[in-house]
Amino acid sequence: MVILPSELIGATIIYIIVYIIIQKLIATGSWRRRRLPPGPEGWPVIGALPLLGGMPHVALAKMAKKYGPIMYLKVGTCGMVVASTPNAAKAFLKTLDINFSNRPPNAGATHMAYNAQDMVFAPYGPRWKLLRKLSNLHMLGGKALENWANVRANELGHMLKSMFDASHVGERIVVADMLTFAMANMIGQVMLSKRVFVEKGKEVNEFKNMVVELMTVAGYFNIGDFIPQIAWMDLQGIEKGMKKLHKKFDDLLTKMFEEHEATSNERKGKPDFLDFIMANRDNSEGERLSITNIKALLLNLFTAGTDTSSSVIEWALTEMMKNPTIFKKAQQEMDQIIGKNRRFIESDIPNLPYLRAICKEAFRKHPSTPLNLPRVSSDACTIDGYYIPKNTRLSVNIWAIGRDPDVWENPLEFIPERFLSEKNAKIEHRGNDFELIPFGAGRRICAGTRMGIVMVEYILGTLIHSFDWKLPNDVVDINMEETFGLALQKAVPLEAIVTPRLSFDIYQSSEPF
């Protein structure tokens, strides 16, 4: 390995800085004649990067109060427009949706998503449409979700028995670990016809840590993404960590592929998701899916399918434990509709308006993705009289929209009843009502929206109905701090002691009846 002399390194850095400044001056001169949205000035070269801090969604929300619902920031050498209100989000994600349907290049897509060969980061085009279509048909769509409802019910049966056993020895429940175990097994059964984790322990903890690390790293504002000329330096060490993490996931996915292929004879007549995808690698739409595409898709589904929904459930339980009257009110509704002689089942959900209101309130106050995955403008455009240059990144502050005092009364309070009022009762979280867009909206709305809503409502409802919850004796108060990432995690995981409230035999079977 050749080591460059320090003088050459210094000269290179100076050259890059001068080049960037010249390019910026040229660009600024051409845009100055046009009306960009307001925003902070930022620093030379690095722009507004230092202003974002460790909690970018919070920093951007504060800036929006000063500069307005549509802001323009120079982040490094890249332009970024931020939408912070429902109307602003609607303008970008509905009116200008097609112009903002691509993703900007970034290190996460390159180093962790097989060079954007997945569904999340793939360019808007035939391959993305095919991956989306196959995922909806065989896993994420309404009919597919019905087909694997028994998998969700059986896995929750395993979870309830484990929690019941823990309650009898006074063992505390670590909510995030419990949810990761259950949800990874649900997804594993649908995709691979197997529970990927048979027992809690080192293996599942390592997987959870990998998922959390991926979602955290993917949410970082990596300097190299915004100043491509110095990306090779990896000043924050982020790309090095991404490559190391990708190797772990690739080893895991390779192992899953090999085990799945070895058991193909056992699935004759009962194909799973991976079987369907492999059978449709060559298709009439002219796209051929490589093994890399399929690995990348499985990575999307495993990580997003476990981490995002589990974070919303954990936040909902946290808010309810801080507000016991909400917990009791939810249990009373369930006792009237379901009783205590059977388990909670998915078909109960439409009959439980207060539970659904709790879930919506959790999605509002604690969206799993505080900032939508960035999009980029394919062409220059105009919005509300503002000029948006080509190749401008778009960030929608979903967290800020959910806490907008012009939209929500007492937005910092957890009040499920707000969704039972005439004003908000018809607001849904499926991408059409821009006051509540936890999954985004438009063409690039989260492909797992339906699954995410079902998972949160069903699992949270089961946990509320099946147990009484309290804090461990050594915990005086609940920590409500956030940790920023692609998914908004609790800084301190929720731990609780549970007490069964149903008949003993209900906890002993994986079947819902």
Swiss-Prot record:
> A Gene Ontology biological process annotation?
anthocyanin-containing compound biosynthetic process
Q: Which domain of life does the protein's organism represent?
A: Eukaryota
What reaction is this protein's catalytic activity? a 3',5'-unsubstituted flavanone + 2 reduced [NADPH--hemoprotein reductase] + 2 O2 = a 3',5'-dihydroxyflavanone + 2 oxidized [NADPH--hemoprotein reductase] + 2 H2O + 2 H(+)
Name the UniProt key words of this record, in alphabetical order. Answer: Heme, Iron, Metal-binding, Monooxygenase, NADP, Oxidoreductase
Name the Enzyme Commission number(s) assigned to this protein. Answer: 1.14.14.81
User: Which pathway does it operate in?
Assistant: Pigment biosynthesis; anthocyanin biosynthesis
Q: Which residues bind heme?
A: C446
Query: Which family does the entry's similarity section mention?
Result: Belongs to the cytochrome P450 family.
Q: Any idea what job this protein has?
A: Catalyzes the 3'5'-hydroxylation of naringenin and eriodictyol to form 5,7,3,'4',5'-pentahydroxyflavanone and 3',5'-hydroxylation of dihydrokaempferol and dihydroquercetin to form dihydromyricetin.
Name-wise, this protein is Flavonoid 3',5'-hydroxylase
Q: Which organism is it from?
A: Solanum melongena (Eggplant)
